[in-house]
Amino acid sequence: MRNRFDQQLELLNKQLIHMGELCEEAIGKATTALKEGSMEQAEKVRIADEEIDQAETDIERLCLKLLLQQQPVARDLRQISAALKMITDMERVGDQASDIAEIIITEEKSEALDIPMIIKMSEAAAKMVRDSVNAYVEKDLELARKVMENDDVVDELFEEVKTTLINFIAENKGLQGVEAIDLIMVAKYLERIADHATNIAEWVEFSITGIHKSSVV
């Protein structure tokens, strides 16, 4: 019975890794679409978001099956409960990537704005998602806590991007100013992705220690 349960837990890990990879790919495609003004890449993000939604459903079904058909001990129960919480944030990562793609699809792209800081934000946020899922699978508390710390890095990048673009808007009217507003929204979505990765890392911490940050007084 325990061997069967362990096999299902391993399947849960594999499905979470797959969902994390889908999230990371969605962020990457959204960033590529932004850099290249590529409608094709933006449409791929929409498809990826649908795949992420399906992955959430599959994992939720597996977790409920584990809870109902098995008798998990406290540590296993924390692991399954954390997975159920994590997939909610991972699904929202897909939504945020899709929101970025929507901006690219609905707005014209100008070549006037350089966006290296937004690309840097995107790479940092994607890495946070990847590391948070890996921390869960590897039961790596140190890595989970590093993800939480990196949220401050993305927050700082967002403030820098926002300040730069607000100054740009003050000096430029018309299409370029509108595009700068869109880029602020993109940066905000990336900041939210980092927040979701942090939430995932906090649930990883709970799965390992039994303590969740929100419950600490």
Report residues per predicted region:
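Cytosolic, long alpha-helical scaffolding segments
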Residues: 1-217
